[in-house]
């Protein structure tokens, strides 16, 4: 056991009104986790964490802990907060294979999960534990979604997702890789074959454009495409990155590891939108930052930039007469992603909302009865823990829906 993990656990004050738990989007019982850890009840602690958050191992690595649990720790008022993420990671990771998921008796009903990202995995695990026969349909060859194809391995090792695949197969969950619903196989086909309910968790994979000249040039890449397979992209010796969220930090830090000598992130405002930890890690890796700058055009050998200012109403505008050229070998656009809508195009019962994401009601049901959705396909690009938080509620709603329709023919 790493010494610092035990030292951090001993720093916990076991607050009667734990602010750390209030800071967690899924209300992880952090004091109880630490108490069990100190009493050497690791497997009990791991089972508790998994029951509350099936993606506990992942979240312990990629959550914005400085804003959530650790950011609310009272120890942080006059010093450093308890390093809760290290404790959670040690427990969840070391005991993962030994966690015994409580499984209800099979109830004879099937549910389909479309998409094996954070939302889909959460739904599949929770419904399988309730006795449903689950099949996951995934367009790629492995599970993980954005966790595998959008988060660098130095932040989230792919081996963790492979272990999740093994765990899910042990739970009886079936997996159809390299298979896209919409087109040859429709949602109606799934209902015809006896699936009582369908979950859509297809994520947000379409890059948001900057809508400036030069965006189609060969030296321009989108963050989601680059992070999918960095080894296939030659960025040259210098890269300009536009956008300052966690994806931009992932691109910048990956580029450094790929040998790019000059990596610069440009942000229109005076601070990044990434988590403070990711920002600091990027600076430590050697990433440069330029604020109050925006791209107006991309050239074959660089970018045209203009200085910006933030008005009183919060709107960012360019300063006239400040346009200047900055040379670089390549450009990466990291200004978020939006969902693709193949399913909507092939299923008239599904509708979009005013934001261009899949429309659902307060219970997560889409405009097509029996079809539910959550995660980035509904909210736009969010975090793993956000997907888990909403998907836990959706799993309960799907369970209630299927129980209410269990006697329907081909429901």
Segments the model singles out, each with a brief description of its role:
Residues 177-193, 292-302, 308-309:
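A conserved short coil-to-beta-strand element within the FAD-binding core of flavoproteins
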Residues 136, 140-171, 175, 252-296, ...:
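Rossmann-like dinucleotide-binding cores of NAD(P)H-dependent redox enzymes
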Residues 216-236, 313-381:
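FAD-site-proximal beta/loop scaffold in flavoenzymes
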Residues 54, 117-118, 142, 245-247, ...:
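Residue-level detector of alpha-helix initiation sites
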Residues 1-110, 200-217, 287, 299-301, ...:
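Ferredoxin-type iron-sulfur electron-transfer modules and their immediate structural context
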Residues 88-104, 163-183, 206-258, 352-367:
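Glycine-rich dinucleotide-binding loop and its adjacent helix/turn
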Residues 109-135, 248-256:
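N-terminal Rossmann-like FAD-binding beta1-loop-alpha1 element of flavoenzymes
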């Amino acid at each position: 056991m790493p010494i610092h993990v035990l030292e951090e656990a001993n720093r916990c004050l076991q607050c009667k009104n734990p602010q750390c738990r209030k800071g967690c989007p899924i209300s992880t019982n952090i004091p109880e986790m630490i108490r069990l850890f100190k009493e050497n009840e690791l497997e009990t602690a791991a089972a508790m964490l998994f029951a509350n958050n099936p993606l506990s191992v992942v979240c312990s690595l990629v959550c914005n802990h400085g804003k959530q649990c650790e950011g609310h720790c009272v120890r942080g008022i006059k010093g450093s907060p308890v390093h809760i993420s290290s404790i959670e990671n040690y427990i969840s990771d070391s005991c993962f294979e030994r966690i015994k998921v409580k499984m209800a008796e099979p109830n004879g009903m099937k549910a389909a999960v479309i998409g094996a990202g954070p939302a889909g995995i959460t739904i599949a695990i929770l419904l399988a534990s309730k006795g449903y026969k689950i099949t996951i349909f995934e367009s790629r060859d492995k599970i993980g979604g954005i966790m595998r194809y959008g988060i660098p391995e130095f932040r989230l090792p792919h081996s963790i997702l492979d272990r999740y695949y093994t765990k899910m197969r042990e739970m009886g969950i079936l997996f159809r890789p390299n298979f896209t619903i919409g087109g040859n196989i429709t949602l109606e086909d799934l209902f015809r074959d006896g699936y009582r309910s369908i979950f859509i968790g297809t994520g947000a994979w379409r890059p948001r454009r900057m809508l400036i000249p030069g965006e189609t040039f060969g030296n321009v890449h989108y963050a989601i495409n680059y992070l999918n397979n960095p080894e296939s992209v030659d960025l040259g010796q210098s890269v300009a990155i536009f956008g300052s969220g966690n994806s931009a930090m992932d691109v910048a830090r990956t580029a450094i590891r790929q040998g790019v000598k000059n990596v610069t992130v440009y942000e229109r405002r005076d601070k990044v939108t990434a988590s403070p930890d990711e920002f600091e890690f990027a600076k430590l890796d050697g990433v440069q930052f330029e604020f109050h700058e925006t791209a107006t055009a991309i050239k074959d050998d660089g970018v045209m930039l203009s200085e910006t200012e933030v008005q009183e109403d919060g709107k960012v505008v360019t300063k006239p007469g400040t346009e200047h050229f900055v040379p670089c070998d390549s450009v990466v656009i990291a200004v978020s992603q939006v969902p693709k809508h193949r399913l909507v195009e092939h299923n008239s019962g599904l509708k979009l909302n005013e934001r261009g994401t899949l429309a659902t009601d307060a219970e997560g049901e889409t405009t097509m009865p029996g079809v539910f959705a959550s995660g980035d396909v509904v909210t736009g690009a969010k975090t793993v823990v956000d997907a888990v938080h909403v998907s836990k509620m959706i799993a309960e709603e799907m369970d209630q829906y299927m129980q209410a329709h269990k006697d329907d023919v081909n429901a």
